[in-house]
């Protein structure tokens, strides 16, 4: 008795299923990495203000950062403004994450504008 070859449609379904699950994994990783990069950047910027009395002119002015911090800082766009700073997340893991934080998160921070802020 001859074994039948797998149907092409089954193969297509498997490939599509894998593709869709990979997209979900990427979106989840973008969220997780984007969140971590944003919070790390905020912490480093706010620490700079505590130490030196003002926000840095650029992210290159941050002192005593670690190698992993550079990954986070490379995922955000920073601009110092008169009354604080603007901080946007430009990259999560691969793509741009869609994040939001409650009003309480922003209290006491110098972030005056962000693509993560409502």
For each predicted feature, which ranges?
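Low-complexity, acidic interaction segments enriched in glycine
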Residues: 31-39, 46-118
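Bacterial N-terminal signal peptides that target proteins for export
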Residues: 2-10
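Bacterial signal peptide processing site
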Residues: 24-26
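Sec-dependent N-terminal signal peptides
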Residues: 9-18
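C-terminal motif of bacterial Sec signal peptides marking the signal peptidase cleavage site
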Residues: 20-22
